[in-house]
Amino acid sequence: MLKLFTSSASRVHHLTPVSRVVGSSPVESPLFKALSQITGWNRRSTSLGHRAFFCSEPTNGEAAAEAETKAVESDSEVSDSKSSSAIVPTNPRPEDCLTVLALPVPHRPLFPGFYMPIYVKDPKVLAALQESRRRQAPYAGAFLLKDDPSADSSSSTDAEKNINELKGKELLNRLHEVGTLAQISSIQGDQVILVGHRRLRIKEMVSEEPLTVKVDHLKDNPFDMDDDVVKATSFEVISTLRDVLKTSSLWRDHVQTYTQHIGDFTYPRLADFGAAICGANRHQAQEVLEELDVHKRLRLTLELMKKEMEISKIQETIAKAIEEKISGEQRRYLLNEQLKAIKKELGVETDDKSALSAKFKERIEPNKEKIPAHVLQVIEEELTKLQLLEASSSEFNVTRNYLDWLTILPWGNYSNENFDVARAQTILDEDHYGLSDVKERILEFIAVGRLRGTSQGKIICLSGPPGVGKTSIGRSIARALNRKFFRFSVGGLADVAEIKGHRRTYVGAMPGKMVQCLKSVGTANPLVLIDEIDKLGRGHAGDPASALLELLDPEQNANFLDHYLDVTIDLSKVLFVCTANVIDMIPNPLLDRMEVISIAGYITDEKVHIARDYLEKTARGDCGVKPEQVEVSDAALLSLIENYCREAGVRNLQKQIEKIYRKIALKLVREGAVPEEPAVASDPEEAEIVADVGESIENHTVEENTVSSAEEPKEEAQTEKIAIETVMIDESNLADYVGKPVFHAEKLYEQTPVGVVMGLAWTSMGGSTLYIETTVVEEGEGKGGLNITGQLGDVMKESAQIAHTVARKIMLEKEPENQFFANSKLHLHVPAGATPKDGPSAGCTMITSLLSLATKKPVRKDLAMTGEVTLTGRILPIGGVKEKTIAARRSQIKTIIFPEANRRDFDELAENVKEGLNVHFVDDYGKIFELAFGYDKQED
């Protein structure tokens, strides 16, 4: 229904004093000048100044009303629709208004002597106000709204909406009882200007729509004008007003007007004036309005003015601080400009453009002969362009950044490579155990470089499961070759601009990763490790895999073009090393340009060596444990590897070893194994404090033990520290440090039952064993069939169907009278059921499982097999020979069956991997049948 008038000018606009000053015209009054500046009133509209008065006494209202009525009687008919400051007759007298419209004021109460613009949204209320003016009774009651306990105070929009919905008794209950009789100064549209006259108190409701109430006119309690306390309080209010005048210019005109003419108003008016112009909240202002005791009202106003004074001081402090900061910066800027001008006149310093040009020329001068001609030409052109541009233009910054990149690249600057094969071998062996094929390839690269006298860039892809050392071996290769190392990961990369750079036309454009690499390392022949190349993304910004073709192709990277530089760069000397977990995810055109080296993972023996020679030393040093303080047995390491860390790599093994040494460190500290020397302090004072504390502790120990000599307790303390027992970690107490075993034996059966055969599988995490289980569901004539479970993929399901067919064929050949497959419904399962599985290499294992069930004969002990089978019984080659061999060794399998076509792959394995294994290579399933079920004949 009502909305408080708001303005960005100041809070004075909400409540503005309208007092007349005796002896001065309204136009010349300083207060009226302030009002005209704030509200926009001018000399042509001075009628409001004539009728804007304090009306706490009845005679004031009568005299002013009669004078104004006579002055503007001829213009009264059109005043409503024109100026908001039109003269309005004020008959009857204010004290005669005992029944008034109740207007809610939402934000601050209206004080006598002040005006307040409000917006009336209710048509009925607006019509009633206009009717009151026409009946020459332009008065209404302005009452502050109480807080709505059910509304969110932080939402002003919701609060105004709730006000508009209030009607009748509901609105009456939300109004404060004490308000102000307000004269309706003007109505223009839905804007109403109210001028406060005197205090009112609501007696009862007369009508609901619009809300009309009976009121009592309130008068101030009698008081002694000569009371010293009242005088002192009033003068303190005036003094505070003067202080506010010094700190805040917002109220300067108002305070000056009222303090200069102190005799023109009374103490009650002074209290109202101070409370009205303060920034007090609505409840504090309402408390002043309701107070009829003049002395108490002055005290309340004084408290509010003191708070206002404190706020003004804080504002002044903040303003001064900001002004000083800005002034200091401006002064510094002017002095710098003057200094530049003086240096330029003396020839000591050139301008910014000349300095930039000199800096860029100085950069390229040492390698000017090595810079390609086309690049040098572009640099010269851009330097000339830079001199013609204004320093404040955006093109100047673009050109400056472009020249900065062009001149900082290492054109023709190559690091001295190491062609010493023996030294390279030593470095590679220091950092990594095993990985002989990778080391051999790097040594071949060095040998070729030594024979040619120079080296060429190559693209090597290290493929293997996580944690086998693909990334770390790239760093070791760089150290062995004496090349700079740079790594960037392309996992999830979906923007071509990350590789090829952005065009310079874009805001914030930057070169690609390769150019950033050259700037970072400072040489043109670094070793660049492109990590996770099998996890490239593809999005709306292009295909990064296609962008890498130009980067990695030896035929193209000699003229690699970055979009930002727009000049070709020679990357033919760069050695690229890529890493991937699965090469199947790498696009074929990209894979074709790489030399793939597979890192299958580590066998148990290799993991033990790595843990003992590398991981344990690093963890011990990181935890501050001395070698003589702990001993980890080989059995503990073996148990840790087999029961906690079965993955192909050693990353998890490193975490577990670090966990063990952290617990050992905690145990040593609790048992008192502290270092002999004091802890290193961050500053000398702290070091002295530590020394004093240590000395006091030693002295305290001497007193307790009643030792006469000062040297004996120190020796005893040292003896106690050294005498702590060495922590022993073995298989029996390993669980106390790393918890319960995570893995259990993959070999589930000592003697595999009928229908169960162990196969070998390969995953991105390495090799593993895989059981194939088959059982009879139902028997009966003509009920033959096969159910398959185990979350198998399409390829593996087809392998099961092929295995069922081949098994029936073999059974028909060997035992024609056996009708097992024709009359038995079978169920083939591959545990574990929660693990997805796919691939053709389990074909021979499935056939063996079916035949074991048909012949009711288990396969031989310690046998595992792998191989794809055709319908004719031929065994096709498989992948992951090393991983599967490692998995078989881990499960203590001694006999393995591989396809004949994989014999060469097995022969290439290291001797420690092949040691102790009885491997059979077959090309037809008939041989597998003899190996699996003919063990009785072999034993005979």
UniProtKB/Swiss-Prot annotation:
Record-linked SUPFAM superfamilies: P-loop containing nucleoside triphosphate hydrolases, PUA domain-like, Ribosomal protein S5 domain 2-like
Subcellular location, principal? mitochondrion
Recite the lineage of the species.
Eukaryota, Viridiplantae, Streptophyta, Embryophyta, Tracheophyta
Q: Which UniProt keywords apply?
A: ATP-binding, DNA-binding, Hydrolase, Mitochondrion, Nucleotide-binding, Phosphoprotein, Protease, Serine protease, Transit peptide
What GO molecular-function term can you cite, just one? ATP binding
Partners and quaternary state? Homohexamer or homoheptamer. Organized in a ring with a central cavity.
- According to its UniProt record, which residues of this chain constitute the active site? S841, K884
Q: Provide the GO biological process annotations.
A: cellular response to oxidative stress; chaperone-mediated protein complex assembly; mitochondrion organization; oxidation-dependent protein catabolic process; protein quality control for misfolded or incompletely synthesized proteins
State the family it belongs to. Belongs to the peptidase S16 family.
Q: What is this protein called?
A: Lon protease homolog 1, mitochondrial
Q: Where in the cell is it found?
A: Mitochondrion matrix
Catalyzed reactions: Hydrolysis of proteins in presence of ATP
Q: Where is this region: Disordered?
A: 70-90
The residues listed in the UniProt record as binding ATP, with positions renumbered to this chain, are: G464, P465, P466, G467, V468, G469, K470, T471
